[in-house]
């Protein structure tokens, strides 16, 4: 089977006092999601999976609508910092931003539940998608750290920050029910040339 793993499109910034931030896509992000659907609509996608976070749901919706599919939402695909009360796209942060300072002091602070728990959660979620979709092509809409840590695990890399996907970057993984995984491509962004 083939996993087509897509990082969500560009979201808005959001700050909340009543719980975790879960921002919607920005106007540019909505255009990126449409461009991604344009590309993937012709690729034989049988099933669409998203994380439970709004930016991933909204990124996957155009493809699901075009294909007449109901997306499956998986809690296990949430981003590593899902508990934060604010979200700012990294491009909008300066060196003094709280998240950047925390990351520079302790890169693993990005993982709300700890790195190992995050790695195990996302790997289990993606393994479950593979097990339930033998012989199918599944588009999975999720987050930068989900993509990065999954690839880090598959490729045997030591640093969870070595591989980072762009907004709507497409990564392809061939996956067999026997457990063999083969990374076929990483961070395809040609469909976004006019939308970055």
Task: Provide a role label for each language-model segment.
Residues 3, 136-144:
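Generic beta-sheet signal
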Residues 55, 146-147:
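Alpha-helix capping/helix-boundary segments
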Residues 97-117:
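Short glycine/proline- and acidic residue-enriched helix-loop micro-motifs
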């Amino acid at each position: 089977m083939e996993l087509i793993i897509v990082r969500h499109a560009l979201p808005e910034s959001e700050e909340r006092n009543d719980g975790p931030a879960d921002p919607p896509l920005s106007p540019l992000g909505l255009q990126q999601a449409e461009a991604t659907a344009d590309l993937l609509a012709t690729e034989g996608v049988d099933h669409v999976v998203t994380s439970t976070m709004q930016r991933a749901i909204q990124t996957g919706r155009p493809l699901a609508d075009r294909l007449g599919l109901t997306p499956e939402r998986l809690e296990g695909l949430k981003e590593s910092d899902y508990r934060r009360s604010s979200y700012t796209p990294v491009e909008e942060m300066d060196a003094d931003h709280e998240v950047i300072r925390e990351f520079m002091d302790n890169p693993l602070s990005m993982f709300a539940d700890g790195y190992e728990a995050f790695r195990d959660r996302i790997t289990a979620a993606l393994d479950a998608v593979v097990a339930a979709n033998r012989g199918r092509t599944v588009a999975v809409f999720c987050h930068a750290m989900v993509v990065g840590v999954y690839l880090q695990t598959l490729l045997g890399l030591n640093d969870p920050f070595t591989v980072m996907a762009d907004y709507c970057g497409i990564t392809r993984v061939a996956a067999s029910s026997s457990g063999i995984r083969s990374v076929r491509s990483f961070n395809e962004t040609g469909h976004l040339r006019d939308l970055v």
